[in-house]
Design a protein with these regions (language model features):
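Cytosolic catalytic domains that perform sulfur/thiol-centered chemistry
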Residues: 1-255
Length: 255
């Protein structure tokens, strides 16, 4: 089994790790830094090269976690699925749940210096989408676009953390802050509660598109939707970091 630490931001390279964890560096090599939006998915060839360098084989089982709980680990899980790899699971509650259970940790950041793996990227079209696909979904009565940002950012009453972005949301998008899918102890809520949270906004619509600030917490919604039994889901890779740039793409301010 391969265990990945997918922590980002202040938690990246933290002081403790699950024993044997390897770095899934979303702030580093596992994002395309030539793209205008942060955390953009790298090319299939680049992703494959990094995963091989981390010793992952096509037959391995993978578990991803992060030090914040349920946060960036969902992005790592979704990226692996986008690249055709399904033998991957998210550690519920992440490192906080692991340590709360009294399980062992090692000091220092996640590292890997072992042999290369044989991972093969097999990209799946449709799981990760661009702005044009989201615009089409907003006009499709059979689809719904859900925004994982806070209610204040969605309404435009709180500033965006990334300079230069407009406040507000896409016309027709609905707000489901990702934290509302997380229950006591930092664990994902039960499947029935997750389904109810999605149905409260989507109704009978089964085709769900997810957005957030930079494509990370949108994947928490994707994880929740998968646990709730939804099969037609997609993540907007650029998310608000792209849509919110000064452009002619429409923005709504307010609830």
């Amino acid at each position: 089994m391969v265990v990945f630490d997918a922590s980002v931001g202040a938690h990246r390279g933290g002081p403790q790790r699950i024993p044997g964890a390897r770095p899934f560096d979303l702030d580093g090599r596992l994002s395309d830094h030539d793209a205008p939006a942060p955390h953009t998915m790298p090319t299939a060839a680049a992703f494959e090269e990094v995963l091989r360098g981390l010793g992952v084989g096509d037959g391995d089982a993978v578990v991803v976690y992060d030090a914040a709980g349920i946060y960036s680990s969902a992005r790592a899980w979704w990226m692996l699925r986008v690249m055709g790899f399904d033998r991957v699971a998210v550690l519920d509650g992440g490192l906080p749940a692991w340590t709360a259970a009294g399980l062992p940790v090692e000091d220092g950041p996640a590292v890997y210096d072992g042999p290369r793996g044989t991972f093969t990227a097999r990209p799946r079209p449709g799981l990760l989408v661009d702005a044009d696909a989201v615009a089409a979904a907003l006009a499709d009565p059979a689809a719904v676009v859900l925004d994982a940002r806070t209610r204040e950012r969605f309404a435009g009453s709180a500033p965006e953390p990334r300079p230069g972005l407009r406040g507000g949301h896409m016309p027709g998008a609905l707000n489901l802050p990702f934290g509302e899918l997380v229950g006591p102890g930092g664990l994902m809520r039960p499947a029935g509660e997750l389904r109810a949270a999605f149905e409260a906004l989507a109704g009978e619509r089964e085709r769900l598109y997810f957005s957030c600030g930079s494509g990370v917490t949108a994947c928490v919604l994707a994880l929740g939707a998968t646990l709730a039994g939804y099969g037609e889901t997609a993540v907007y890779d650029g998310s608000w970091s792209e849509w919110g740039m000064p452009s002619d793409r429409p923005v709504v301010v307010g609830g």
